[in-house]
Regions:
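Well-ordered, non-membrane alpha-helical segments in soluble/globular domains
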Residues: 36-40, 68-77, 146-155, 190-202, ...
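Bacterial N-terminal signal peptides
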Residues: 6-16
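Aromatic-lined substrate-binding rim segments of carbohydrate-active enzymes
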Residues: 40-50, 54-123, 158-160, 186-203, ...
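Substrate-binding cleft of secreted/luminal carbohydrate-active enzymes
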Residues: 89, 93, 242-333
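An active-site-proximal structural segment forming one wall of the substrate-binding cleft
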Residues: 80-82, 114, 127-170, 196, ...
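Catalytic domains of carbohydrate-active enzymes, especially glycoside hydrolases
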Residues: 33-60, 87-91, 238-248, 270, ...
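Aromatic-lined carbohydrate-recognition surfaces of secreted/lumenal glycan-active proteins
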Residues: 25-33, 165-175, 197-227, 246-255
Length: 333
């Protein structure tokens, strides 16, 4: 009986210690092109588990003219969220996935010194780059002239919002310019691009010393980890570790082979040293969990983010019917 009692006491002590030692997981709801829903989505505003909103703002929206900054949308969202006891997280969008949307200011596309400001991204089947179709735009992150303008934007944003917003993240590191070099834009190489991401992340961290800084780093052009690891993605994570910038990515896909081999391993390595933020984006709710052969559940998404990636933040998209039918009910339990 004495042994049994000791076992019970030991078990209870473990249970009591867990809540105090477990790392809290913060839940935000993501609003992108549906930003206007921020103020009308009652399920978001009335669910306490949702601590705030991650809102995507395009560079083009924030700088309508050279050195003419318009942060009115950020101010409006910050004020509205504050009134409702919630926080704002900014996603700075300099890439798009539609031919219709060019993410950079118009002056960058017209002044020759910026070489167009942005370049087309492409999609194609297998390795058929000859028949590639346009699939959006990416700012010329590696172009010194464009980079200089981008850093000025960061400084202007930080001057007004550092310490007021919960955090800010860059869009994903992945760009789709093919793998053979035939579709590479002017001045682009995987090595130059790697160095540009490192430089931009350092600039973001210098600008924002109070709010959390995160680089979405999922894939890098010119390599495919782990079979063809050139050190490009690892260099970005190394910089994050050195500067204490956070890391994360735009897709939460438990046990998906491509992500497991590329970014997830590196994210897990830095967990506990820097902030980890992961996003559930369109299509993620319908992911088939390789462990079960069934569509992933909200509980499984959270468990993978918390237990494997050791995430601090999850950003949930509002894709229907999953957001209303699955996520909101789960968060209100």
């Amino acid at each position: 009986m004495r042994v049994t009692l000791r076992m019970v006491i030991f078990f209870l002590s473990l249970c009591a210690a867990t809540p105090a030692t477990a790392k809290p997981l913060h839940h935000f709801v993501f609003f992108g092109q549906d930003r206007e829903k921020l103020q009308t989505t009652k399920s978001f505003l009335e669910t306490k588990a949702f601590e705030g909103a991650q809102v995507a703002y395009m560079w083009r929206q924030l700088e309508p003219g050279k050195d003419e900054y318009d942060f009115s949308m950020i101010r409006e969202d910050l004020a509205f969220l504050s009134q409702h006891g919630k926080k704002l997280w900014v996603q700075l969008q300099d890439v798009t996935f539609s031919e219709r949307w060019v993410p950079v200011p118009r002056y960058l596309t017209r002044d020759p010194q910026y070489h167009g400001g942005a370049n087309r991204q492409y999609q194609y089947k297998a390795d058929d780059e000859e028949h590639a179709a346009a699939a959006g735009w990416a700012a010329r992150r590696w172009d010194p002239a464009v980079q200089d303008r981008f850093h000025k934007l960061l400084a202007a944003m930080a001057k007004e919002f550092d310490g007021k917003i919960e955090g800010i993240n860059f869009a994903e590191s992945s760009v789709t310019f093919g793998s053979t070099g035939k579709l590479y834009p002017e001045g682009f190489t995987p090595e130059v691009y790697r160095d540009a991401l490192v430089t931009n992340l350092k600039a973001l961290k210098r600008a924002f010393s109070k709010s959390i800084v995160v680089q979405y780093a999922n894939f890098m052009p010119g390599e495919w980890r782990p079979s063809d690891d050139r050190g490009y993605l690892r260099a970005v994570f190394k910089t994050a570790k050195e500067t204490k910038a956070g890391v994360g990515g735009p897709d939460l896909l438990p046990y998906q082979r491509g992500h497991m081999g590329n970014s997830y391993e590196l994210i897990k390595e830095l967990a506990g040293e820097v902030t980890v933020a992961i996003a559930v984006q369109d299509g993620n709710y319908a992911h088939i969990n390789p462990k079960t052969g069934k569509r992933v559940t909200i509980a499984e998404l959270i468990a993978f983010a918390s237990d494997y990636l050791k995430a601090d933040y999850i950003f949930w998209c509002t894709e229907e019917p999953y957001y209303s039918n699955d996520l909101v009910g789960f968060m209100r339990k």
